[in-house]
UniProtKB/Swiss-Prot annotation:
This is 3-phosphoshikimate 1-carboxyvinyltransferase. Belongs to the EPSP synthase family. The keyword Transferase applies. It is found in: Cytoplasm. It catalyses: 3-phosphoshikimate + phosphoenolpyruvate = 5-O-(1-carboxyvinyl)-3-phosphoshikimate + phosphate. Monomer.
Amino acid sequence: MIVRIYPSEISGTIKAPQSKSLAIRLIFLSLFTRIHLHNLVLSEDVIDAINSVRALGVEVKNNSEFIPPEKLEIKKKFIKLKGSGTTLRMLIPIVAAIGGEVTIDAEESLRRRPLKRIVEALSNYGISFSSSSLPLTITGKLSSYNIKISGDESSQYISGLIYALHILNGGSIEILPPISSKSYILLTVDLFNRFGSNVKFYGNKIHINPNNLVEFQGEVAGDYGLASFYALSALLSGGRTTIVNLWEPKEYFGDHSIVKILKEMGATSEYLDGKWYVEAKDKYSSIKVNIDDAPDLAMTIAGLAAIAEGTSEITGIERLRIKESDRIESIRKVLGLYGVGSEVKSNSILIFGINKRMLSSPITDCLNDHRVAMMSSALALVNGGVITSAECVSKSNPNYWQDLLSLNAKISIE
């Protein structure tokens, strides 16, 4: 798919894309209780999660209603994913808690991602692994209710272990610092507690005392990280937008912190009663921000930093190298195509803002990374541009291009 983007001014109201992080967690909750998700958007990552719980015995009706099995067991000995890193990393400890043997494989983007920390951790507790990357055969059953794991590679392992210890009727997790993307662990903890469980997270330790979980029926709330590209599009194009279907931002740093970050850079950016109001200003300020706890915000911040006055610095970026693409390199390449200079350091990237009238009108390949396409499309709204392999947005937000059209973006889809 090729998308041609012409200079446009974004305006209007848009519903935030459903949070795939929350959707995947809700789908995995169907291992314990009935879940009915209204109007579920079937992104590629969500489909990976659905296929995973189906392989563990969950009855799935119309890809929206999920009924837990009487007994959890591995129904399929081979689980094939597409590209959902969240699903993969949560699934590994879950199948280890259920016990048995299963082989997991996925597309090349996931095969490149390391699984070292979860393999190291669970190998100490009765689990055998064929390798530390995909394809991966897992054999055995967790032999301990008290797990130690390094927290530097992925928070998704810890989220998966919270599910695993609910399967084992309780236990504890000790996370060896540093703890990356802590906000996503807090999301999992909050979700279980909201459903009636008893999960405590103090310092670097999590204690799980399961209770029966209540059923859920409703719609998946919006995703601040994905919605931020609509906000970025408005700010770069000199427009305004209102984004609905978002929960109130939490106190801890996470994807929702983008509301505050954009405001600090000079934009009108306010949350009120479930709506995020965004309006462009004539100029934006540079910023220094650590995104280790919310790495998915990197491309949105980089996009606005491209036209901010002065030099911005995004730190805590080390794990961006193991996303759908090497996102550090992807940010550098995309900015360069639009005529924006940047400099990569050991754990940060400097972005040298320019006047937006100086932005180029390039052809950008999305590099099989949905966020590359979204960042580039926002920049292209200023002076135009072309996105190739633009179907990559289907990984997280299949409606992205239609949403831009509804916000008065001038684009053609080939």
